[in-house]
Amino acid sequence: MRGYRSSQRTFFRGFDPRHAYRFRGDGRHGGMGGALKIVFLGMMTYFIAKKAFRSSQHPPTDFNAPVQSVPQRAQRPSDTRLQGPVLLASNHPSGDSASPE
């Protein structure tokens, strides 16, 4: 134990380690205790992981409303260009062709 004492003296360098009980994890002298720290960290990890998993899922839905699936024919193919307001300018009754192409 003599080597432990000398290394402890050089490690703490200036303050008495007997008064450093707040930094130890034993439950006797005001510390939280090792088991309590592990439980707390485990709970925090669980809740953070649960929140991250839920946010990566689909957006939250109203559980009282029935789930409606989108019919297959209502979905657009992914390779078509945007139709709608962009091409409506060429159908203007003035006769001008304002087509961007």
UniProtKB/Swiss-Prot annotation:
What GO terms fall under cellular component here? membrane
Keyword Transmembrane recorded = yes
Map out region (Disordered) in residue numbers: 56-101
Result of knocking out the encoding gene: Does not affect the production of oxopyrrolidines A and B.
Give the membrane topology.
Single-pass membrane protein
- Mainly localized where? membrane
Provide the protein's localization: Membrane
Bias (Polar residues) occurs at: 66-81, 91-101
Q: Where are the transmembrane segments?
A: 30-49
Domain of life, per the record? Eukaryota
**Role played:** Part of the gene cluster that mediates the biosynthesis of oxopyrrolidines, polyketide-amino acid hybrid compounds with feature structures of tetramic acid. Does not seem to play a role in oxopyrrolidines A and B biosynthesis.
Write down what this protein is called: opdI
